[in-house]
């Protein structure tokens, strides 16, 4: 399942980040790394962006970015 498919109110764990190295670096710079727990706070009406809590702070992630983060 991807981060974009996760249900609001759920907590997921990052398994993998798809994409090229520059893209992965940008996602990891946001604090989203393998093994990190993410709480899905809210999804905008059209699914973009997804609001999450990661490492104690709130973050909005674009739908395109969320689709490349594989979670369980």
Predicted regions and their residues:
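Compact, glycine-rich, soluble single-domain proteins
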Residues: 1-72
């Amino acid at each position: 399942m991807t981060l974009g498919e996760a249900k609001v109110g759920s907590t997921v764990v990052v398994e993998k980040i798809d994409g090229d190295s520059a893209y992965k670096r940008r996602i990891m710079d946001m604090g989203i790394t393998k093994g990190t727990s993410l709480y899905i706070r809210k999804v905008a009406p059209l699914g973009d962006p997804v609001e999450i809590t990661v490492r104690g702070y709130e973050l909005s992630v674009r739908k395109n970015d969320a689709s490349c983060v594989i979670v369980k």
